[in-house]
Amino acid sequence: MSDSFKYRAFIAYSHKEAEKAEWLQRSLESYRVPTELVGRETRFGPIPKRLFPIFRDREELAGSAELGPAIENALKNSSHLIVLCSPSAAKSIWVNEEIRVFKSLGKADRVLCLILEGEPSVSMS
């Protein structure tokens, strides 16, 4: 991870999937990267010993038309975006806005999708 990023990743999810997002955050932050991979160079920098910290918002977003400075700042300061994909996430204006903002920062190649439920091609019909 570049020193310019505060977070290894930002988890975008529908609050219906909050329990799964919390599990993923705990799992990633406690994961120990195999010793033989640590330090190996990648296009995103050297592989770290730990995938810590991971950003996950812990409260419902207020009923406003924008994400808010704390969320936007976390997106700017995250190396990667992990999207928990589900029908409810696809319908969430907040998840879609988090993806839009992250991609607008020039990091579209750092978006990782984890399909929880649904069919990937359904939203493209």
Where are these regions (language model features)?
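Switch/connector loops and helix/strand junctions flanking conserved nucleotide-binding motifs
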Residues: K20-A21, S64, A90-I93, E119-S125
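Conserved N-terminal substructure of TIR/SEFIR domains
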Residues: M1-L84, K103-D109, E117
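Short, charged, amphipathic alpha-helix that recurs within catalytic cores of restriction-modification
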Residues: W94-K103
